[in-house]
Amino acid sequence: EDIERYLDIHAGYVYPVDVPFDESMGGISVRTFWNSTPPFYDTNNLSMVAFFKYGPFKILFPGDLEEDGWLALLEQPAFRAELIDTTVLVASHHGRENGYCRALFDYCHPRAIVMSDKAIVHDTQGMTQTYRQRVIDHWPNGVLVATTGKQRRVLTTRRDGWIQFNVNDRGDFTIYTECYG
């Protein structure tokens, strides 16, 4: 039932936009990837993965992709190439265990990881330390959060509230958060 609804929605968005995205968004460009049916029929692994880029800053939004979906996308050379200079990764599936794929970090070395999640109520939500280590592997100091003056590697809506990245065209960015956690 979910897959049928997803396919109907997906088929409905086939109309071209009037202005190219990168011309109407002030220099922001987007590149998307997704898995096909078959082999995937679950909506999580059919998530559209979007890379938004402004200057050299790039943020990756993978939706609810799970490990099998990541592994399928990693078979594509263009996807692997796009991962290389990712600045920020939004953790897949709200940072849950089933959205984590260790092989992703062979190509993607983000300076920070963002997890959009609520209070911990499931054992599968305890991935913050794992994601933190993936940042430390390549960026030991993480990023500076202007609101708190602290170096961070993982930011979560659970702890930080809203998270805002102000980015200039040189790729420099400042992070602000709602909370002072």
Predicted regions: what they are:
Residues L7-V88, R159-G181:
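Core dinuclear metal-dependent hydrolase active-site scaffold
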Residues E1-V14, P110, K118-A119:
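Active-site HxH/HxHxD metal-binding segment of metal-dependent hydrolases
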Residues W70-W162:
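Cap/insert and terminal regions of metallo-dependent hydrolase folds
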Residues D2-I3, T130-Y131, G171:
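Short secondary-structure boundary/capping segments
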